[in-house]
Amino acid sequence: MTAEEKRATVQLVCVLGAYLAYVAIVLVRAAGGPVTAVDYVAPLVGSILVSIVVSIVVNIVINAVSSTSRDRKDARDRTIDRFGEHSGRWGLIAGATLALILAMLRVDPFWIANALYLGFALAGVTAGLAKLVAYRRGLRTW
C-alpha cells in the first residue's frame, strides 16, 4: 500500500467516523424529541476538529513507522488524487445547493448546518472511496 493510499484510507475513516459520531450524539441528545431543539453546534465543530486532529496524528504515526510512507507522489498518485477529488465534488455541490434552498425557504438553521455538513461528509467519503478503488483497480484509459 502506497503512502497516498494510506492517506486516502485515513481520510475516509476519519470523515465517516466523525460524521457518524456527530449524528449519533445529536440523536442521543434529542432522546425522541425534536432534533432542532438539540444544541448541535458544539458536537458539529467538535467532530470536525477531532477528525482533523486524528487524521494528522495518524498520518504522522504512519510516516514514522512505515518506510513506504516516505515515497514521493508520482504521476499516478497525482492522477488518482485529482480523480478522487473531482469525484467527491458532487457531494459538496449537492450539500451547498440543499443548504441554499433551505435558507431561501427560511428553514431552521439546524437543517441548513446539517445539509452543509452532510455535503462535506459525502464529498470526503466519495473522494476517499474513489481514490481507494482507483488504487486497487486502476484508472480507465480513454
Task: Kindly give the residue locations of the regions a language model identified.
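Alpha-helical transmembrane segments and their immediate juxtamembrane interface regions
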Residues: L116-W142
